[in-house]
Amino acid sequence: MVATFNPAVGSHVWVEDPDEAWLDGEVVEINGDQIKVLCASGKQVVVKDSNIYPKDVEAPASGVEDMTRLAYLHEPGVLQNLQSRYDINEIYTYTGSILIAVNPFRRLPHLYSSHMMTQYKGASLGELSPHPFAVADAAYRQMVNEGVSQSILVSGESGAGKTESTKLLMRYLAFMGGRGAATEGRTVEQKVLESNPVLEAFGNAKTVKNNNSSRFGKFVEIQFDQSGRISGAAIRTYLLERSRVCQVSDPERNYHCFYMLCAAPEEDAKKFKLGDPKIYHYLNQSKCIQLDAMNDAEEYHATKKAMDVVGISSEEQDAIFRVVASILHLGNIEFAKGTEIDSSIPRDEKSWFHLKTAAELLMCNEKSLEDSLCKRIMATRDETITKTLDPEAALLSRDALAKVMYSRLFDWLVEKINTSIGQDPDSKYLIGVLDIYGFESFKTNSFEQFCINLTNEKLQQHFNQHVFKMEQEEYKKEEINWSYIEFVDNQDILDLIEKKPGGIIALLDEACMFPRSTHETFAQKLYQTYKNHKRFTKPKLARSDFTICHYAGDVTYQTELFLDKNKDYVIAEHQALLNASTCSFVANLFPPVSDDSKQSKFSSIGTRFKQQLVSLLEILNTTEPHYIRCIKPNNLLKPGIFENQNVLQQLRCGGVMEAIRISCAGYPTRKHFDEFLNRFGIIAPQVLDKNSNEPAACKKLLDKAGLEGYQIGKSKVFLRAGQMADLDTRRTEILGRSASIIQRKVRSYLAQKTFIQLRISATQIQAVCRGYLARSIYEGMRREAAALKIQRDLRKFLARKAYTELFSATILIQAGMRGMVSRKELCLRRQTKAATIIQTRCRVYLARLHYRKLKKAAITTQCAWRGKVARKELKNLKMAARETGALQEAKNKLEKQVEELTWRLQLEKRMRTDLEEAKKQENAKYESSLEEIQNKFKETEALLIKEREAAKTVSEVLPIIKEVPVVDQELMEKLTNENEKLKGMVSSLEIKIDETAKELHETARISQDRLKQALAAESKVAKLKTAMQRLEEKISDMETEKQIMLQQTILNTPVKSVAGHPPTATIKNLENGHRTNLENQFNEVEVNGNAGKSAAERQLENVDTLIDCVKENIGFSNGKPIAAFTIYKCLLHWKCFESEKTSAFDRLIEMIGSAIENEDDNGHLAYWLTNTSALLFLLQKSLKPAGAGATASKKPPITTSLFGRMALSFRSSPNLAAAAEAAALAVIRPVEAKYPALLFKQQLAAYVEKIFGMIRDNLKKELSALISMCIQAPRISKGGIQRSARSLGKDSPAIHWQSIIDGLNSLLAILKDNYVPLVLIQKIHTQTFSFVNVQLFNSLLLRKECCTFSNGEFVKSGLAELELWCGQVNEYAGPSWDELKHIRQAVGFLVIHQKYRVSYDDIVHDLCPILSVQQLYRICTLYWDDCYNTRSVSQEVISSMRALMTEESNDADSNSFLLDDNSSIPFSIDEISNSMHEKDFASVKPAKELLENPEFVFLH
């Protein structure tokens, strides 16, 4: 495969091994052409130098995505690369444009999600990781761009995954060419996809190698129109394995449909008279009845569902399953010898039962069915002869009938599917997907294997020609000189098989036409004809077998059944029987045979199949082919097992190794200039000159190495076979010499370093010793000086201490004397002050005691009166409460009671305040009168004392003065009378004071009772409020539920108008409790028919005027949108919110929808985003569902009660008047909204979300192109020849990152200029950064060349720029930076050094805590260090990740390593409401254009 190379000792090579195919090892000894190799397994082998191949030690551990990039393109290199990728679940690998798919035998749903299809859409082949989607996309793009039909050929042996790969291709083509929007009925692509389950049910079966093996070939033509949309399709099938219906080997199964029908629901099983599949002969020949991974009952329902999709009616489905059931019953008919010679009849009652059941299911005559199985009619010229069949012949007849019925049924299904799908006669382009059997070689190979291998021979020839063509195109593209490349042509094998006359098929047809021919005579004919043919041999000791040397190996065929299987005819009795069936479906399967066809020449399966192959190849030759080779890694059908020998054989059978051999025949090694110089620049470093370009440098290097025959292309170096190994050998020798030099230098450096350290150590020890001696002398001197200083300081301390004690004692004595004098003086002053205070407090106490008595009496009187009035009102309220009727009246009266009780409480509080004031005034009067009485009492008392003293004096003087004049006696009497009067007045005052005290006590008691009653009334008021609130909540819930039920039908169409609403609405009632003078004038007009029409027309004109004004950009006022504010004021004034029918909302919605038709104008969209969000905020604050806020929105009822009248006086107080004035100035008014208003609010919310999404998507679209340029660092070659390019490379990426920041700044400026709410700006940036995170992260995981150290540093520098921008606009960016967490952690992992020392816990908990195991595994396996050539994480870490992935393999979500872009709306209406305030709109001015219009006077 490659030329012999000259290995050196230490070279790494591959040696052949009978068990493992190839083993890697190291050359340890060379003796001429004998090479001793130490294998990695530990054993030593001696081989010839011609039997070893070089190994690329620098190949990445995870393999390469395209094997043409391998340094050595040979069998062991290819095998090792596939195994390395298979071990890390990378099951797809390119070989040029050929995709190799290794069956993982496990579910990998993350590889086939819709998100993955989106990733591959439009990506160039090789740009992303290998995938069937990439092949399908390349075919689709080539068809659309070049106008050339395409074909995708999927091949491989049974169990390799051909069917699944075909499904993926068809799914992706349906994704690319689908119609998108739903159409009536099923689309073409849906029918094409759903045809797979139907064909699998009737054409797939379990074989030894595969549980779901396709036993037929399939070519699906998907037709496209000029725009690239699927317009039609056709399915062509080849060579159904009919013999499987009657003969099943253990442990295989028959076709799936038989087992599905047996597992059908009980009613279907009874209808078809079916039971356990083990009782049917056609099924119980094998012990395998049930498959572990397949539920036949579920598959039955899935198949019926697929039949519905592809257009098979329920009647046709019933007929199909009746035919299938009849075949099972036919198989259980056994025959015994009849009464006549060589005749037969059904053996027993069981056979008769199955015969009868089969006849019933086929709707034919039971006797006719028996005759068709047991008899033959021979027609001669004169008469018709009936011939009986013996039991053995009857069994063969039975099996022939079963096989032909199933074959016709399968053909009908294919034809029905094609008819249902429909072909486009005008289609010019198609993409064909070929799913056909791979090369087969078993112990027993019959006619089916012969036809299958013929197919593979034809396809292999087509494949070789395509590969050769690709090689030529590659050479032409690189403009190199090339000569004709020889490759193995299998035309001689094809001539051997299909040449006419003289080919094997022609001889087989000839043998079939002779009645007496047997397989032995046919074999002898083959032996005679091809005894000298190099591709044909006769096995030893074989009488009827023959061997053909195919391209993939020798295959021995057994001819026993060749003749029977090649005959393509239907027994006449079977044809007549089924054509006469009363079931139209069965009769149509066997239409009457025309006379022309009866007289036509012999037709065979082989010839017909050969014609089908010719037709297929004609189609393929008119298309551009693409190849997918499916590989089965092991025969155990288990994951994680890679059998080298098995895979190698399949690579050979699939033609992959032949393609590699063709590549090796020319220039097998192709390296880009930079890769070549980076790898081999060490051979001739002097050629890496600053002034040299890459091609010249490569040429100089190759000339320096003395190689010849190479070619320098436009972008690559093309090397002959073996030249890469020679270069690697020289490189290894140079590296070895360099290693020796490095080792010598290192040893010299280490010895020198040791000597220097010893010398430094000796010097340091000497310095330490000298220092120690010097420090000892210095320490003695310090101690002597210190002793002298201590003595001096001690003497000074003792003297100072004696003086300080004497000084302190003197001061202490003086302080004690002065303190004693001061304390005596302080004590005297305290006594004087205390006496004064006691006198003052005593006088105050006496005065206060008298005042409290008077105040208590006054309060008692007031409380008694208030209690009387309150009880009277409470009694009236109770009577009114007992008279309540309906729920609404109860609610209104409760509201009235609550208000009255509220006002009563307020009045009570006010009365308490007034009474307090009256108390104070009365107390003041009482105090003043009391003082007067006390003064009079004191004066009277003083007079009495004087009188008593005068009387005493008189009594003392009386004995002396005997004679008193008359005048003195009269004066005495007057004084006595006056004294008596004063005494009486004093006693009456004392009585009056006692009565007043009693009344005060009684009043206090009554006041306490009244207070209790007032508290009880207040508690009752609270309870009534609670009850009323509950009633309101119930009513509100009922109304809200009603509104929600009405609105559910329009939730998904917020932009459309409400059906059923007329364009105009009749104004029934314009009163809402807040009428202006202008409204009063309008409502006073008599509403008759003509006046109503005029008002409606005026309303429509006003709405038109409003829309004409606000549909233009009328700007902002104080940072708030004028249009939104104007619309809200107009709708509020026109009472549209309270109207049951209005067209204003529909007109506004239409206006907004037409205003945002230009989806690319971010400025215009931002303007309307601000307006719609502001208007939504105003509606959110204003609108209340009907009945939910009736109490708050209604005007307080006018009351004539005492408390109501008194409350009116309270409303006119200064504080309440100011509050009313502030409420009048409020912009937002609560309104009880009707259904149209609530619908308008929902539609407005939908438009806010829609405009937000449009702006966000525009930004994403702008950034998408830039992100793709920011993910991969520019490649920089080794040496100076790229220095100028490096300097440009540093600036070029920065331009793309700066362009992203410029795009963000541009949009931010637009949003700020249009005053978009801050919360929406933050959400836009948050979702945009999340999009950037998803795109960068997914690109990193899908492109191996991105998972490098240098690329990590490159992306990290770009992320730093974004972080700086987020810091600069932190207010508007919000938490956007946190959205980049995945790419930040992934890049952080790429740029850390010494990854092999990092443990799994360190990665999961410290480096990348947010990443899943699948994502970490993907990064670790793809990573390669392009700067320092260090290793990735250790194998233990990889094993830990793989174990965890195996545990989570059943979870589809956990298996996905890609991120999904979240396009949902990330905010709610409440967030918008919380970001604004009502006061922000207080200073907003309406549109100036409307202020001049007399109809909009209310805007002033």
UniProtKB/Swiss-Prot annotation:
Q: Name one GO cellular component term.
A: cytoplasm
Q: Name one Pfam family in it.
A: Myosin_N
Fetch the InterPro entries from UniProt.
Answer: Dilute_dom (IPR002710), IQ_motif_EF-hand-BS (IPR000048), Kinesin_motor_dom_sf (IPR036961), Myosin_head_motor_dom-like (IPR001609), Myosin_N (IPR004009), Myosin_S1_N (IPR008989), MyosinXI_CBD (IPR037975), MYSc_Myo11 (IPR036018)
Map out region (Actin-binding) in residue numbers.
496-530, 532-555, 590-613, 613-635
Myosin N-terminal SH3-like domain span: 8-57
Q: Kindly list any coiled-coil regions of this protein.
A: 884-1049
Q: Where in the cell is it found?
A: Cytoplasm
Which residue range or ranges hold the Dilute domain? 1146-1447
Similarity comment text for this entry = Belongs to the TRAFAC class myosin-kinesin ATPase superfamily. Myosin family. Plant myosin class XI subfamily.
The free-text domain note is:
IQ domain mediates interaction with calmodulin.
Assembly description: Homodimer.
Any idea what this protein is called?
A: Myosin-8
The species is Arabidopsis thaliana
Q: Which gene encodes it?
A: XI-B
